[in-house]
Amino acid sequence: MARGLALILFSLLMVFGSAAHAEDDPIAALIQLNKQMIKSVKDGDMDSAQQTFDTFKAKWKKEEPSIKKENLSSHSEMDANIAMISLSFINQDARKLKTQLEELASHLETYQQAVVLKKTSSGQSRASLTAYIQSLKDTKQFIEKKQLDEASSAIDNLVTSWLAVEGDVVSQSKEAYTTSEENLALMKAEIGSHPEKVSKQIDEMIQLLEPIASSSYSWWDAALIPVREGMEALLVIGALLTMTKKARVTRSSTWIWGGASAGMAVSLAAGIGVTVLFSSSVFGENNFLLGGVTGVLSAVMLLYVGVWLHRNASMDKWREKINIQKSQALKKRSLLSFALIAFLAVVREGLETVIFFIGLVGKLPLTELIGGTAAGLIVLVIVGVLMIKLGMRIPLKPFFLLSMAVVLYMCVKFLGTGVHSLQLAGILPSDAESWLPSVSVLGIYPSVYSTIPQMLILLFLLIALVSEAAKHFTNGKELTK
């Protein structure tokens, strides 16, 4: 296992090292040309500004494909901005032209910062996190100057560039990682209505990230990544294995481990693909999208497991199911569902985990990286074995109640974090309600889009518990008659 892991990490080192050579800044000339246009317009020299704009457009056409590939959102904003500038030149509207050129300058500078954040190879990782912190400070300056449109654009770039630095952050501080992701969503939601809150959220992120930018790595950081990221998936897989063992369902472990293995393969392939085919800033929103979709799907499947557990919580029903050995069709359907849950649970965390490891390559000796990773995986294996062994010793009734509580807890958390990721990806609107609680460790965020579905799940749990208690009360009364 260690030898295979070493080969995988060595391959990732080769891939990451070859993919991380950054090109020269493709838009420095565009920024300079834009400054010349602003100066010409301020001086009232529209002819000179027009000539510079013609040069700018030629340069833009040349660089446009790479800009579009790097950050589609920024490209769309700048392309629309350039179209409006062309119209203002036709109308000879110097006042509008000056405003539009200044807005374009803001977009170009924000994009330039995002390109710097992309450069996360071994010699640039600390500079990247430092640059991210500087981008936070620049965003705060936009807010202080009441330039909210520029601040909103800068926040969008902070979100898409987060993937370039999150590996540095999560390996050093889980608190900084979860708080930063939560704040990014809140910043998107509140920049238009409560910029003063956004300013405080930026200060909090800076305070959390600055110590990390000056810290160093060790094998311990590599060991913590699989433990932190893999524990939730292990909890789901362990519960599934224990349930199917108690149910005496044949070949159940094959299906569940098959789903988990497929999830690991997809995560590894996607992680390598990200480093080879895409830049971090391009993949940033897509990573949030993937995390959101897998989170919500996992929640739906876990809710199915919760219903299944509730239906079989009765000892009589459970013995009846075991005695009659459910129909083969039902077995296959249940096993396929369990395999899919294992797959989603692994993919949900697996892709980010692979990217985190790729981010660590070059930041500490390869022997420490491999040794730390192996140590973390050994801890996961020990926890998994203990979980299954202890689960088999628990009596059937308490086991079902405990399993249902664990499954529904994971369901609530996966749903909350999934919706949160979809908001960061821009699929769902970002909102922040002051009257809603925020407990990131439970996947609870101050958003009605995540809180309402979570409340419905908790309502289901309450109804299930009340229903079960009512049945016991009714059966008890009948026995006393």
UniProtKB/Swiss-Prot annotation:
Q: Where's it found, cell-wise?
A: Cell membrane
Where is it chiefly localized? membrane
Look up the record and report any one GO term of the cellular component aspect: plasma membrane
Membrane topology for this entry? Multi-pass membrane protein
Sorted keywords for this record are: Cell membrane, Ion transport, Iron, Iron transport, Membrane, Signal, Transmembrane, Transmembrane helix, Transport
Please indicate if the UniProt record lists Transmembrane helix as a keyword: yes
**Reported phenotype of the disruption mutant:** Severe reduction in Fe(2+) and Fe(3+) uptake and in cell growth.
Tell me a Gene Ontology molecular-function term this record carries. ferrous iron transmembrane transporter activity
Oligomeric state and interaction partners are given as:
Component of the iron transporter efeUOB/M complex composed of EfeU, EfeM and EfeB; EfeU is essential for the complex formation.
Role according to the record = Part of the iron transporter system efeUOB/M involved in iron import. Mediates the uptake of Fe(3+) ions, delivered by EfeM, across the cell membrane.
Provide the protein name.
Iron permease EfeU
